[in-house]
Amino acid sequence: MERFIENLMYTSRWLLAPVYLGLSLGLLALAIKFFQEVFHVLPNIFDIAEADLVLVLLSLIDMTLVGGLLVMVMLSGYENFVSALDITDGREKLNWLGKMDSGSLKNKVAASIVAISSIHLLRVFMDARNIPDNKLMWYVIIHLTFVLSALVMGYLDRMSRYEKSKAA
């Protein structure tokens, strides 16, 4: 009975495969919105104010960072929790594949969230005169919470790696 339960639990990791595949649909939706924004701004490029263009570009950068985050979570999550990716050497292989454990993935995700939050905060500050002070304060507090969380996660990861190397 114990062996059956263990095998069932181990096999159940494959339930994550369609979830990771579903993230690729999210990536497709993000790409569609990205190009929708590009096609929306291009016809008006000579009429748009510089500040508005910067806001659009920040939005595009934001979407690009989210897309990179999706790819990172999809591929490394699949590889860490479902199965190793069997990519032939002749194809373009991302150099970080197979090297990112769940701790590294968490740190990369946290760093990406901080970068995305930074871009969003910059976009908010570009329009600060139209946003109430208390709302600006909350944007900054939330961003600093992301930064602090990323720093603490990085510190804890470093400490656990240090403890592992010390024990070895």
From Swiss-Prot:
Transmembrane as UniProt keyword: yes
Localization, UniProt: Cell membrane
Top-level taxon of origin: Bacteria
Record-annotated membrane-spanning stretches: 15-35, 53-73, 136-156
Pfam families: UPF0114 (PF03350)
Main location: membrane
GO-annotated cellular components: plasma membrane
Annotated membrane topology: Multi-pass membrane protein
Keyword Transmembrane listed: yes
Keyword entries, A-Z: Cell membrane, Membrane, Transmembrane, Transmembrane helix
NCBIfam families found in the cross-reference section: HI0507
Family: Belongs to the UPF0114 family.
Protein name: UPF0114 protein PC1_0431
Species of the source: Pectobacterium carotovorum subsp. carotovorum (strain PC1)
